[in-house]
Regions:
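Active-site glycine-centered loops adjacent to acidic/histidine catalytic or metal-binding residues
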Residues: 42, 383, 394, 463, ...
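C-terminal and late-domain segments of enzyme folds
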Residues: 435, 439, 443-534
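Flexible phosphate-sensing "switch/lid" loops adjacent to ATP/NTP-binding sites
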Residues: 1-324, 333-350, 357-358, 365-371, ...
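Extended hydrophobic-aromatic, low-complexity segments
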Residues: 304-307, 320-324, 338-341, 360-364, ...
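Cysteine-nucleophile active-site neighborhood
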Residues: 16-19, 23-27, 31, 344-439, ...
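Beta-strand->loop->alpha-helix junctions that form or flank phosphate-binding loops
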Residues: 236-241, 329, 408, 485-488
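Short beta-alpha connecting loops at secondary-structure transitions
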Residues: 56-64, 243-247, 353, 374-380, ...
């Protein structure tokens, strides 16, 4: 069987959920026994989102091989239970960088380098790259942005060319659009969808399936109208109605026959019925919790829901594993201090101090750590959260009042957190941190060892600063146990306080590897500790 290529575009408005639709379709195909992966093509000129402020584009998701990518890759991994890679996220910046580098090397033999064919050829090469590995039956490509945007036009043109170049049964186009509901008229309006599809068709791409985001059910008459004016088969207009959980969307799409439509169009015979029992069992646990807990997520980007997307989703997975509803309260670190910590955090069953960069909000994070440590509240720190746990311990237990990270105070007399040695000569910011999966050896008898149930793990990282091993002996003697280290470098990966009911912090990002079917163990045990406290 030839590799099949599916493209998902969006129209009318942004943030309709192309990534969720792409991941849901991938889940339906995977459940039929097909080998599927998804790739995201982003039309911004940044090489990757690694240097983007989370307020700009949400969370930066890190893959096993160290790629800093769009948060949609997190959805892909969580829905499918697979690992993505650098090849799964392509930006305009990467495309132009490759083409300009080739031009400087003389690869184009003196030709005038243009959008068409040189940029579009490179886009097509990347679109087909994963399909040529032989590892996948189906490649789903999500094209970022909205049809009509100037920056996405080269990607649409590359799609148009592939639609013409590939066999008809190997190419499928899905267009996600919005059907707004006018409350005053009590009517769903199809005109924006008609215009969006017409614009896509004017660019030479003809969608095979139209998925309509809507608050209300689409009547058969409305579906027929959309099909008629958008030139698709009557049965190929389907609805994506607002769901109570994103993990319900694959089941909704299966009920709309999306999986069957795609398999039929791509002419893939002999597939079994989809096996979605594990997903249904997860949703059943999620929908019927036996207990509830309140957990504070203390961070500096809390105003944007997507800034801590993987952490939020990890709590969903861990909650279902414990048959517990986790209410996550996102708290702005800048608003927390020693004086109001009891008022702000007193009703919480657990405290998680989130990752981040820079000075803003650090003292608030330290106050949150102190409150959790001194009031026996279950605590979980991630990356910067772990570093601030170390700073708080140094200040308030070791008595080093001026202890700090050199990230914010290069002249501190007690640099308990310091720049990694191999980072000290680095001047380029993008893609130069310690990124991707690294090994961590867990100490015998530690909380971390009991949680993971194994001696060695591998988790993903994204940081420049580390625990300063010059303070290792003093910290351990005072009660802060180092329970996880990198076996190759000795870099401290996990700290915990054995005398505390549950106090653990990691330099790595465990949230990147949590899925509904395999919830991350640290999150599962943290939620369990919060339940026990309550």
């Amino acid at each position: 069987m030839n590799t099949k290529y599916i493209f998902v575009t969006g129209g009318v408005a942004s943030s309709l959920g192309k990534g969720i639709i792409a991941a849901s379709l991938a889940k339906l195909l995977q459940a039929r026994g097909l080998r599927v992966t998804i790739q995201k093509f982003d039309p911004y000129i940044n090489i990757d989102p690694g240097t983007l402020n989370p307020y700009e584009h949400g969370e930066c998701y890190v893959t096993e091989d160290g790629a800093e990518t769009d948060l949609d890759l997190g959805h892909y991994e969580r829905f499918l239970g697979i690992h993505t890679s650098k090849a799964n996220n392509v930006t305009t910046g990467k495309i132009y960088h490759t083409v300009i580098t080739k031009e400087r090397e003389g690869a184009y033999l003196g030709k005038t380098v243009q959008i068409v064919p040189h940029i579009t050829d490179e886009i097509k090469r990347r679109m087909l790259l994963l399909g040529k590995t032989g590892d996948y039956d189906v490649i789903i490509t999500e094209v970022g942005g909205t049809v009509g945007d100037i920056e996405s036009q080269p990607f649409i043109e590359a799609m148009r060319q592939l639609q013409w170049e590939l066999p008809e049964e190997d190419f499928l186009s899905i267009h996600l659009t919005l059907i707004p509901y006018l409350k005053a008229a009590q009517e769903l309006k199809t005109k924006p969808t008609q215009h969006s599809v017409q614009e896509l068709q004017a660019l030479g791409v003809h969608p095979d399936i139209i998925v309509c985001r809507t608050e209300k059910e689409l009547s058969p008459e409305l579906r027929h109208k959309i099909a008629l004016f958008c030139n698709v088969k009557p049965g190929h207009v389907i609805q994506s109605i607002d769901a109570w959980s994103i993990y319900q969307v694959p089941l909704n799409m299966e009920a709309e026959n999306l999986g069957k439509m795609v398999v039929d169009k791509l002419e893939i015979p002999g597939l079994p019925e989809p096996d979605l029992e594990a997903l249904k069992a997860f949703l059943e646990r999620l929908k019927h919790p036996l207990q509830e807990v309140d957990i504070a997520l203390v961070g500096k980007y809390v105003e944007l829901q997507d800034a801590y997307k993987s952490i939020q989703e990890s709590f969903v997975h861990a909650g279902a594993a414990n048959s517990c509803k986790v209410r996550v309260h996102t708290l702005q670190a800048e608003n927390i201090n020693d004086g109001n910590a009891d008022e702000v955090l007193g009703k919480m069953d657990g405290i998680l101090v989130a990752p981040g960069f820079g000075e803003r909000g650090l003292e608030g994070k330290i106050s949150a750590v102190k409150y959790a440590r001194t009031h026996n509240v279950p605590f979980f720190g991630i990356c910067l959260g772990m570093q601030m746990a170390v700073v708080e311990f140094a200040r308030n237990v070791l008595g080093y009042a001026e202890a700090a990270s050199t990230e914010v105070n290069p002249r501190t007399p007690h640099p308990v957190i310091d720049l990694m040695e191999d980072q000290k000569s680095t001047t380029i910011k993008g893609g130069t941190m310690r990124l991707g999966a690294y090994k961590c050896r867990l100490a015998e008898g530690s909380l971390a060892r009991s949680i993971y149930g194994t001696e060695e793990i591998a988790e993903r990282h994204r940081h420049r600063y580390e625990f300063n091993n010059a303070y290792l002996r003093q910290m351990q003697e005072a009660g802060l146990k180092v329970s996880g280290v990198n076996p190759d470098t000795g870099l401290v990966e996990i700290v915990e306080i054995p005398s505390h009911p549950f106090f653990i912090a990691t330099q790595f990002h465990p949230e990147y590897k949590s899925t509904p079917e395999h919830p991350q163990p640290l999150f599962v045990h943290f939620v369990k500790a919060c339940m026990d406290k309550r």
